[in-house]
Amino acid sequence: VMNLTAITDADEVTVKHFIDSLSCYDERFFFTGAKVLDLGTGAGFPGIPLAIMHDELKITFFDSLQKRLTFLKEVTTTLSYKHAEFLHGRAEEEAHKDIYREAFDIVTTRAVARLPVLVEWALPYVKTGGYFVALKGAAYAEEIEESKNALKILGGMVEVVEPKKLPGLEDKRAVLYIKKVKNSPVKYPRKPKVAVKNPL
């Protein structure tokens, strides 16, 4: 079995991966046939739970490690989920390809990086009028404040902040629904690792 997640206890997996992943599901955003990019999907969260919840979503699982995508191909085949696509590469590079740029109704992220970095990585993939959906932990309000400049530059607006509580857990978390209100400038995202070292 591939070591793709640090959480292995069945109850913890249920709460911390599946229920947490589904906390972002809202029919207002995840409409039938929506093209979804699960950026930095890892072991398939939130992408796999979303595919189970709504099998008419067209989800592209995106990761920099091929072994994770190989595993997810097996999972989606086992689930008979027919709309899966797989993208191997870096967020900062694939966004500059016409086939992916501003091509998705929704981009999801969970436990990938701080929000100013994610805004630069994710929004270039989102169609104008679409949404970047970020699952964030306790520091979400602070991260939103940190992201004001990045949002302005990349064309995003925080439309909904939905605080969440998971069963049996005391920690704060929230789902952020960030609307793409204008095109992202073509120079973004910047080259690999620049956003992390020097956030907007």
Predicted regions and their residues:
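Class I SAM-dependent transferase core
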Residues: 1-37, 67-84
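Conserved SAM-binding loop of SAM-dependent methyltransferases across substrates and taxa
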Residues: 43-56
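Helix-to-beta-strand junctions that scaffold the AdoMet/dcAdoMet cofactor pocket
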Residues: 54, 126-128
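Short beta-strand element of Class I
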Residues: 56-62
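S-adenosyl-L-methionine
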Residues: 62, 69-102
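Short alpha-helix immediately C-terminal to the canonical SAM-binding loop
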Residues: 68-70, 140, 144
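Conserved beta-strand signature within the Rossmann-like core of class I S-adenosyl-L-methionine
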Residues: 129-142
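SAM/dcSAM-binding transferase cores
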Residues: 145-200
